[in-house]
Each structure stands twice: as structure tokens, then as C-alpha cells.
Amino acid sequence: KPWPHTEEVDLQLSFSAKNACEIANNFLEKGFNVFIDDLVGRKLLEQYSEHFKNDNFKTFLLLPSLESLLKRFDERENKNNEELRKRTQDLHKSFSEKKDKLNWKVIDSSGLTLEETVDQIYKELLNTN
């Protein structure tokens, strides 16, 4: 959850997801495939799932190892942000605990480049259609 977590934050996240869904619908109506890149927990995942229940909706969790994630974090320009580094660790722990409890395909992207990760997602989409 975002910090600090408040009702206002929940409302803003819900509006953000609603707007993403509406924009996605514009593209779906014209025959395009749509990917929404978002960091979601159970509540937003349910919101997306409900909105797209009549579409071919798939969810993916990109979950590299904590070691790989922290290495990527440390290679960033703003790597001196200890609060964000701690948040990264907390999110990894949370998603690791939830990974088998929600309806999404988990991809370990530890050793994958961006292009390889995209290829893996496409392979998963082809295997489930």
C-alpha cells in the first residue's frame, strides 16, 4: 500500500484504475490488445477483473528475486533513497507471500531483460488462449 495509507489514497487509486479501464476500453473497441502496467493488490485486482470480466483478461506478476530487485534498485540514479529501498523490500515480501493466492501468472524476471520479459508474457498469452 502507498505510504502514508489513507482513505483518500484508496479513492485516488480506485479513480486511477477506473480511468485506466476507460482508456483501455477505447482501444479494445477498436480491436487493439491492451496492457495496463500497474502495481496492484487484491482490491484493485478485483476492480480490474470485474471491469474486464467479459474480455480476455489476464494478469501477470513480475517477481524477480529480492537480490535481483535490490541490484536493479542500486543501479538507479536515485539509489540513495533509503525509504524507497526499504519500501521495495516490503513490497517484494508482500507480493512473495501473495503470489499463489491471487489469480495471476507469476514470472520470475530476475535474469531477464525487458525484451525477454515481454517475450515471456507473449508466450504465456499464447499458451492460455
Set out the residue ranges of the language-model regions:
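Conserved substrate/cofactor phosphate-moiety recognition/catalytic segment
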Residues: K1-N19
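Conserved ATPase "switch" residues in P-loop NTPase domains
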Residues: A24, L28
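Short catalytic-loop micro-motif centered on adjacent basic/acidic residues
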Residues: V34-D37, V106-D108
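Conserved phosphate-donor/acceptor-positioning beta-strand/loop module used by diverse small-molecule
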Residues: D38, K53-D74
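Short, electropositive alpha-helical surface patch
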Residues: K43-F60, Y122
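Small-molecule kinase domains that catalyze NTP-dependent phosphoryl transfer to phosphate-bearing small molecules
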Residues: E75-Q120
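C-terminal alpha-helix
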Residues: Q120-T128
